[in-house]
């Protein structure tokens, strides 16, 4: 097989261009010569044989589409001549045997993590500031301005201006020349170099546009999401802003936390603006609670932990025609290694699994799990179709341009 193009699976009838392929190039795939009838862009695909309208197209060994136009052997596969298609799947498991990778090089390895009281171990140590409704986003901006830069955490700014240095020079009676020559610009690196709390990685301000104004189920889903952030082992504690009259009430968030972490002992400070004496009092209280929370969080130090305590979160971004033959297999193998060591891997963006549903169903350990996944994919597909869309619209124009 040439290094310039590749057939990923013996069942595939389209070929991936590893480099740009010029029209007229003679390619050799699986003992067959194919002359390219047009130039094929890097990351894009060309046909291994002729396709009639409706013919099935395979890649990675699975059905990915059907021809919408006649396609000659050696021609580019595009959204103009192919439409999305995927194999039917059933809520019944086929025989599957997982072969665990060799973990002998990793069984005694550890990582330096933050040990939480519930037994979970984080790889980071953050404090969260969360609004229960979008009405409180402004207060998060105020808190961020009051804390982030002063405590030495990275801000969105590339530099900071220290006007106070000029004021101090003036008060000290400095000459105009001395004041003018006083350095007042700090780079982002200089700001973070003097971080006050060395064991706290930062403060995350989780602004959003939910919590009120929609249906009640939206707020119920929101508080479950926020509860998940709070109990995450990468989080030391949280400051919660509530307006008071919104759909997403404090009690709902507390119930959501108790549902997933009944023994949660992390500090969570709830501030309700409509119960506060004034906005200034609310901000003062929030700053003090958050600062003292950071003081306690800073007492937690990294300690060795087994790899079985790791949970690897997987997320796509900028996917292209090479993702399926580079990053995805690498992350898949890393996930297999981690799972074999007793750890976990989580892929939450389930629409990415369209086309391999049966493979995932086969891998489920219980009938309950396989039904849950089956129902999830079926419900999402039905919801997308109901609004005139579908899985075929998952890739963005940028993804498609880059060969996905």
Where are these regions (language model features)?
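Metallocofactor- and cofactor-centric catalytic cores in central/energy metabolism, strongly enriched
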Residues: 1-404
């Amino acid at each position: 097989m040439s290094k310039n193009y590749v057939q990923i699976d013996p069942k595939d009838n389209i070929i991936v261009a590893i480099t740009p392929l010029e029209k007229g190039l003679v390619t050799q795939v699986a003992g067959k010569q194919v002359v390219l009838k047009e130039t094929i862009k890097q990351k894009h695909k060309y046909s291994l044989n002729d396709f009639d309208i409706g013919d099935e197209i395979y890649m990675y060994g699975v059905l990915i589409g059907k021809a919408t136009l006649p396609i000659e052997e050696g021609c580019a596969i595009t959204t103009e001549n192919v439409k999305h298609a995927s194999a039917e799947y059933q809520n019944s498991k086929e025989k599957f045997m997982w072969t665990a990778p060799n973990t002998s090089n990793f069984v005694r390895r550890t990582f330096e993590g933050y040990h939480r009281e519930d037994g979970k171990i984080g790889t980071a140590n953050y404090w969260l500031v969360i609004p229960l409704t979008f009405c409180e986003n402004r207060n998060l901006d105020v808190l961020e301005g009051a804390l982030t830069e002063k405590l030495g955490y990275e801000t969105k700014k590339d530099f900071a201006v220290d006007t106070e240095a000029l004021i101090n020079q003036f008060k000290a009676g400095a000459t105009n020349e001395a004041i003018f020559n006083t350095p007042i610009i700090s780079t982002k690196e200089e700001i973070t170099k003097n971080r006050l709390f060395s064991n706290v990685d930062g403060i995350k301000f989780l602004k959003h546009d939910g919590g009120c104004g929609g249906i009640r189920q939206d707020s119920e889903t929101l508080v479950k999401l926020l509860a998940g952030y709070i109990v995450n082992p990468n989080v030391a504690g949280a400051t919660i802003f509530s307006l008071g009259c919104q759909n997403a009430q404090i009690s709902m968030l507390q119930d959501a936390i108790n549902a997933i972490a009944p023994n949660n002992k992390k500090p969570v400070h709830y501030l309700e603006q409509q119960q506060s004496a004034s906005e200034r009092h609310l901000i003062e209280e929030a700053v003090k609670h958050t600062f003292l929370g950071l003081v306690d969080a800073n007492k937690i130090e990294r300690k060795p932990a087994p790899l079985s305590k790791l949970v690897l979160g997987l997320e796509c971004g900028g996917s292209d025609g090479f993702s399926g033959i580079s990053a995805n297999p690498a992350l898949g193998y890393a996930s297999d290694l981690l799972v074999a060591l007793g750890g976990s891997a989580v892929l939450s963006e389930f629409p990415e699994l369209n086309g391999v549903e049966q493979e995932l169903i086969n891998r489920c350990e219980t009938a309950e799990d396989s039904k849950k996944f089956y129902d999830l994919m079926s419900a999402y597909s039905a919801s997308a179709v109901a609004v005139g869309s579908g899985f075929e619209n998952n890739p963005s124009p940028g993804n498609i341009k880059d060969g996905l």
